[in-house]
């Protein structure tokens, strides 16, 4: 896992360079990001996100943060008049593409997983959907998530993971051959989608991700596979009593 922070695609890069390259990926794909997600996953990412939103179980008065929230898919599923929902993302372009000109009940704020513009222990629930594999330093990000969560607060992390063995050859062939072509045709940036695929390939599997969370002192850690493990939702709590 530590290696993820030093790679971009198949290249070894220094962490600051990786950060800049990841930013440039999302800057370039922002206007086609939602369309590409629908095409690449046949719309199934929407079902995964609905399941994530259901697990959030929002309550009146809560502060819910959607970290790496991008165009705000998840934030829109959990927003409501009786709670505050904030998207935090370093890409102004992604947030602009999602915000459009519509008024919504979502607040948008620039920030990274490694450094969020929030005081300690203020967040009831933090979601991160297809964002954690983009962060440059996952341990720092998990420590930062811990910092902003209230005691008893929960992290819900939806991410691509390792599918069941019989599915893997088909999944890898699809990722390797189909997605970069779609990226070229639709998003006009095949290299950006090459990075996305490579970052999925290098990301820890379900059990390793669970161990990373436990190593950062999260408790009650469990996960739920979606679509035979193509995606996975990890749920983890900051210990303490929810106030
Ligand atoms: C694959 S998109 C996911 C967007 C959205 N959450 C979704 O599920 O559709 C990844 C997002 O992570 C953001 N990102 C990249 N590096 C980040 C970092 N260090 N901290 C937080 N977000 C980051 C990108 O700007 C991008 O919006």
Locations of the language-model features?
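N-terminal auxiliary segments of SAM/dcSAM-dependent transferases
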Residues: 1-24
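Conserved alpha-helix/loop element of class I SAM-dependent methyltransferases that forms part
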Residues: 28, 32-35, 41-62
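Class I SAM-dependent methyltransferase SAM/SAH-binding core
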Residues: 63-116
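A short acidic, Gly/Pro-enriched loop at the edge of an enzyme's catalytic core
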Residues: 114-125
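A short SAM/SAH-binding and catalytic strip from SAM-dependent methyltransferases
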Residues: 124-138
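A short glycine-rich, Lys/Arg-flanked "PGG" loop and its adjoining helix->strand segment in the class I
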Residues: 139-154
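Conserved class I S-adenosyl-L-methionine
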Residues: 154-183
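Core SAM-dependent methyltransferase catalytic element
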Residues: 217-243
